[in-house]
Amino acid sequence: MLKCILLLLCVALNAPLASAKETLHIYAASSMTNAVNALVADYSQQHDVKLVTVYGGSSSLARQIEAGAPADLFISANEEWANYLVEKGLVKPNKVVTLAANSLVLIRPTAQPVASFELQDAAAWQTALADSRLAVAQVDAVPAGMYAKQALQHAGVWPELESRLAQTNNVRLALALVERGESPLGIVYKTDALLSDKVTIVMAFSAQSHLPIRYPLAQLNDKAANAEWLAYLRSDAAQQILQRFGFESVSE
């Protein structure tokens, strides 16, 4: 009996340490879902590391990380929430890099055409919305909503539209409202609009109408796997994947 126990112990001690595979937890803005999934799939073919992804609104993810969520990397849809973690002492300032850029568009359900109108025409907005609401992410917390508010303010129609909003917890939920026809118009990222054949882009907002839409990537610790993942993201292969999903490259 003792020999059996010793034999089993030796086998256990010499067995491959499958559980020792390093794990990276990547917390990323909802608008990055499809692109990050593709990046993870490509990276996993070449590296022996487990990548766990968590998606949501940047504000929600930042607060989860502040509360102790086990994130190794955080991809925000704006600089504010990455800076928030820097201010909280959870990320060093030199551990934040810009991953990609995006743009903002107005969308409608593909099956529900709307008459063309000028962004500055408040009456035309009211006519297009009729008895419904404009789908946007939360304008005071979620980056996509914050950019939408800035764009509407720039167009001079914010006072008329502020009470006509259907605000959601993240940009993908705003997209879904338009996809289902529950909102006749919505403001989302170009990358989100390109993913759905259920919505059509009505027009794009000028880059001057809102702050630059940048995606900072914050490194929360010094795991060796973090450095390898970051090096991969700078590669041509990773940049091509991001561009395939409509993201724009950014020079640091």
Report the location of each language-model feature.
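Sec-dependent signal peptide recognition
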Residues: 1-8
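Exported/periplasmic ABC-transporter solute-binding proteins
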Residues: 20-46, 52-55, 59, 63-69, ...
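Short active-site segment of divalent metal-dependent hydrolases/proteases
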Residues: 75
